Amino acid sequence: MAIDRLIARREVHLREKTLWRMLYETAGRSEEILGVNIEDLDFAGRRCPAKAKGAKSKSRRRGQVREDFVLETLYWDAGTARLLPRLLKGRTRGPVFVTHRRPGPGKVVSPRDICPDTGFARLSYGQARALLDHHTAVRGVGTGWDLHEYRHSALTHLGEQGASLLMLMAKSRHKKPENVRRYFKPSPEAIAELTSLLAPGNSSR
């Protein structure tokens, strides 16, 4: 699988490998994953809360923070579980994904977006997108993969493996069935495997 080959490349930094694997296994939106803090992680349960796109507010007060919104749960599996401890290296607070430098002078950054141990700032969407493009572009800057492709690929692969519409909606957290049906586009390989069920003497019939 192309995603596995990309993550296995030696020149790819551990931060990027972890981010890409987590995006794929959670089928989460990039902004959701980039917004997760270490203290949000449930390592044993392989899950974490995240502020989803269009998250409902718990109150109407001004200056709302993350805790003022209804959070949704993202689930990951063994690949992310192996990489996260290596990435964090004992850090227990602050953003999971950080830059390799401190914010510039005069730049106002929320305390939640700063690692209290290193002073490094949260990795932004633009930075994460540029890093992915750097490793996947073949026809110049801007021609590489988009971060959303991990979510799309995850849901497509689940659809090909027979996940039901309801399960895909639960995993993706889409509210409308029509937004999920597009992932039910089986590959030629999946159609060939399905066709094999019609072979003479197939015991499953």
UniProtKB/Swiss-Prot annotation:
Active site: R29, K58, H148, R151, H174, Y183
Coiled-coil zones: none
Domain Tyr recombinase: 1-196
PROSITE patterns: TYR_RECOMBINASE
Alphabetized UniProt keyword annotations: DNA recombination, Transposable element
SUPFAM superfamilies recorded: DNA breaking-rejoining enzymes (SSF56349)
Molecular-function GO terms, alphabetical: DNA binding
Entry superkingdom: Bacteria
UniProt keyword Transmembrane, yes or no: no
GO process terms (BP): DNA integration; DNA recombination
Pfam families: Phage_integrase
Family: Belongs to the 'phage' integrase family.
Protein name (Swiss-Prot/TrEMBL): Uncharacterized 23.1 kDa protein in transposon Tn4556
The organism of origin for this protein: Streptomyces fradiae
